[in-house]
Curated annotation (Swiss-Prot):
Gene3D superfamilies: Putative methyltransferase TM0872, insert domain (1.10.150.170), Vaccinia Virus protein VP39 (3.40.50.150). Specifically methylates the N4 position of cytidine in position 1402 (C1402) of 16S rRNA. InterPro entries: RsmH (IPR002903), SAM-dep_MeTrfase_MraW_recog (IPR023397), SAM-dependent_MTases_sf (IPR029063). Belongs to the methyltransferase superfamily. RsmH family. The keyword Nucleotidyltransferase does not apply. Keywords: Cytoplasm, Methyltransferase, rRNA processing, S-adenosyl-L-methionine, Transferase. One of its GO terms (molecular function) is rRNA (cytosine-N4-)-methyltransferase activity. This is Ribosomal RNA small subunit methyltransferase H. Its EC number is 2.1.1.199. PANTHER family: 12S RRNA N4-METHYLCYTIDINE METHYLTRANSFERASE, S-ADENOSYL-METHYLTRANSFERASE MRAW. The gene is rsmH.
Amino acid sequence: MEDFSLDGNHGHVPVMRDRMAALIAEHVEALGENAVIVDATLGAGGHAEFFLNTFPKARLIGLDRDQNALRDARARLAPFGERFIGVQTRFDGLREVLESVEGDIIDLAREHGIAGALFDLGVSSMQLDQVERGFAYRTDAPLDMRMDATQGITAADILNTYSHGDIARILKTYGDERFAGKIASAVLKEREKEPFTTSARLVELLYDAIPAATRRTGGHPAKRTFQALRVEVNNELDSLKNVLPQITDALNVGGRAVFMSYQSHEDKLVKKFFTDLTTSKTPPGLPVDLPGTAPQFKQVTRGAETASEAEIEENPRAAPVKVRAIERIGNNSGDLS
């Protein structure tokens, strides 16, 4: 989510900013003042600001679970006045927002559906820069990792209370960690001496648990474990699974949803959902689609798009991004009224 390079007063330029706008441009411009865009991972507001400047007639709904990010984004986007509304929620709270929140922009979305939506997944650079949040493994900090600091368990809670099997499963599933079992054993042994509270102790454990040969070639030894803990703390995959049908249901005909994934498990979920949604339900072998079985969506991107070499050179955090976009082409269920 919002992995950035530097940009003037606000510090960051969103990854693939121009391409994200281009993917939704045609339909948003065609709808004019009836166009509602959803930035479901508002972060510092970089993408949202660019969209509002690029599409001067459009309105935008911004979602973020992080109250600090939402506060800063609201201040940044205040010049756009009533064209922007920000709501604190996980992005899989989208349906509830569209059904329950009051406001002119929400009413417009209920009446006309969503013209374009962006999901920039993962942790933001703004969160990484806030040492006390515990997302970064290169600086000693509390093992927190909550995107909404008022809710849920922390990374320390997981390390201090989860079973060996659950810790190993999390590290393997969410971090692709080859040494998940060995790390889990080391965690259980260490927490008997003293509960985990800060990141430096965990990083030291990981250096000891992961073989030297792997440390030399596999990147920072803490990267995969910290990623896995963050995903578990914030229920990131469940949120993604939940929101995929929510946003596609909310799109109007011609509306597009764009997902930026930085981890393989995220991209696999998006890819499978898009494939299922764009495949005819007609039994194989029939020459035409039976009534009611034709797909109501098409994939806009051919496979997953990636950042250009020039962008990666300017902003190395763009290197892993995979972009997929889908468009509603029929059966307008975007009308939520």
